[in-house]
């Protein structure tokens, strides 16, 4: 049968939780404290960057359900810092190191929010 969720340790020593379906919570919080960050820079040319992306509605192939969002390949051109990748394994896979899977792009939408904030700031100028 299909998995409900799995966790894996990535080769860069980060961890990923994959959920087959929707996740519901009151909040999903990311670390954002200035004290945790180095090399802080305002996003330059935010308006030009956002114009490299479109907002889309689409149907997800794996479940046929409608969604809205961005395309990772466009985000990669606009602001590569928000694009990552993950592995998708076949049903029944153990996720063991070296096991075959399909790599696909992911988008950190909170990073896209940072870009949108800066677009609004640029429109004030």
Spans of model-derived segments:
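Ordered hydrophobic segments in well-structured contexts
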Residues: 4-6, 117
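Structural detector of coil-to-beta-strand junctions
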Residues: 1-4, 14-16
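Long, leucine- and charge-enriched amphipathic alpha-helices
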Residues: 102-125
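C-terminal intramolecular chaperone/autoprocessing and neck/assembly modules of extracellular spikes
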Residues: 9, 13-109
């Amino acid at each position: 049968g299909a998995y409900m969720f799995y966790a894996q340790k990535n080769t860069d020593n980060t961890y990923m939780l994959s959920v087959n379906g929707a996740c519901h919570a009151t909040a999903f919080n990311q670390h954002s404290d200035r004290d945790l960050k180095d090399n802080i820079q305002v996003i330059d040319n935010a308006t030009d960057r956002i114009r490299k992306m479109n907002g889309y509605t689409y149907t997800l192939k794996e479940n046929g359900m409608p969604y809205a969002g961005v395309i990772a390949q466009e985000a990669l051109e606009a602001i590569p810092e928000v694009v990552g990748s993950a592995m998708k394994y076949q049903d029944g896979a153990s996720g063991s190191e070296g096991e075959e899977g399909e790599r696909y792009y992911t988008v950190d939408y909170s990073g896209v929010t940072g870009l949108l904030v800066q677009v609004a700031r640029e429109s004030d100028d």
